[in-house]
């Protein structure tokens, strides 16, 4: 096969202008003989990455509300169940160990620290998958794809079923917390671990509630949002409003968002990564253009 577009370099044996200077125009055609060579260059066949095309196609249109990709499967529910069971086991060890050792304040303070740091942890993870990697990234590729879709159609998260939305985090919690449950009996450690893991496991649900209208939320959730214990819609709106610079990544309580945004912590991290590795975050370009 040859390309329809051919490179045709023109090569002349003699300089044309001196030959024709003193010759009548009517005789020029018989003397203007040029040797023309055609170079036929085979076209290089393009083999697009079919898998990439399929993945990108998913981001073209929002899925309908009854799309199976938004529904929970049995596997999703099993992972959520495993994650919740693991967190409960850690919490039980904290309570039982605290009463057995006659220490209650320390596990409670450790739990509070876990709650506060879980918000920070959710922000760091949210920032990472929003800005780096793609669908082919090991372990978190599907979450990165979902995050990109979320920035195109934020309202989709309100119709995504709980197990579908949280199973990936529940799986991670199961693998990380279960060894601690089996190996450690310290009530203070489990006070921190159980609260941190609980907040991380449910942070995507907190995120979904922050996109929902108050009229559709349970009264207790609205009360917690108004008290600042859970991320509210008013707090989270900045994350989707600033198209050139993402903000408000933390999605448990949002308590860290002002600190991180005012001090431009994530912007500093992005610059460091760019200088060191030459990788630009997606926040440096319009996310809706992807």
Annotate the PLM regions.
Residues 105-134, 199-208:
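Hydrophobic alpha-helical membrane-embedded segments
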Residues 91-109, 179-192:
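Helix-coil boundary and interhelical linker segments in multi-pass alpha-helical membrane proteins
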Residues 74-94:
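The first (N-terminal) embedded transmembrane alpha-helix
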Residues 142-148:
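Extended non-transmembrane interhelical loops and adjacent amphipathic helices
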Residues 89, 102, 113, 117, ...:
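N-terminal membrane-targeting hydrophobic helices
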Residues 82-88, 163-181:
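Core segments of transmembrane alpha-helices
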Residues 76-81, 105-112, 190-196:
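Transmembrane alpha-helices of multi-pass eukaryotic membrane proteins
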Residues 2-74, 132, 136-139, 152-163, ...:
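Cytosolic/stromal cytosol-facing helical appendages immediately following the last transmembrane segment
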């Amino acid at each position: 096969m040859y390309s329809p577009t051919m490179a045709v370099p023109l090569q002349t044996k003699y300089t044309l202008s001196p030959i024709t200077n003193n010759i009548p125009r009517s005789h020029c055609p018989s003397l203007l003989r040029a040797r023309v060579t055609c170079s036929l260059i085979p076209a290089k066949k393009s083999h697009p990455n079919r898998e990439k095309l399929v993945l990108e196609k998913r981001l073209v249109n929002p899925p309908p509300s009854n799309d199976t990709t938004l529904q929970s499967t049995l596997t999703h529910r099993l992972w959520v169940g495993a994650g919740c069971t693991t967190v409960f086991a850690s919490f039980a060890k904290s309570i039982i160990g605290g009463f057995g050792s006659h220490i209650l304040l320390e596990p409670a303070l450790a739990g509070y620290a876990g709650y506060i740091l879980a918000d920070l942890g959710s922000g760091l993870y949210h920032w990472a998958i929003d800005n780096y990697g793609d669908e082919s990234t090991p372990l978190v590729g599907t979450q990165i794809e979902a995050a990109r879709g979320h920035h195109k159609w934020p309202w989709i998260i309100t119709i995504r079923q709980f197990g579908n939305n949280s199973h990936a985090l529940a799986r991670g919690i199961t693998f990380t917390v279960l060894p601690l449950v089996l190996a450690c009996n310290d009530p203070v450690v489990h006070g921190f671990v159980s609260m941190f893991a609980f907040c991380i496991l449910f942070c995507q649900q907190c995120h979904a509630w922050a996109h929902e209208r108050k009229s559709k939320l349970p009264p207790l959730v609205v009360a917690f949002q108004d008290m600042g214990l859970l991320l509210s819609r008013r707090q989270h709106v900045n994350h989707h409003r600033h198209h050139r610079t993402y903000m408000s990544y933390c999605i448990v309580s949002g308590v860290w968002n002002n600190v991180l945004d005012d001090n431009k912590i994530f912007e500093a991290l992005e610059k460091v990564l760019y200088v060191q590795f030459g990788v630009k975050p997606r926040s440096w370009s319009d996310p809706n253009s992807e």
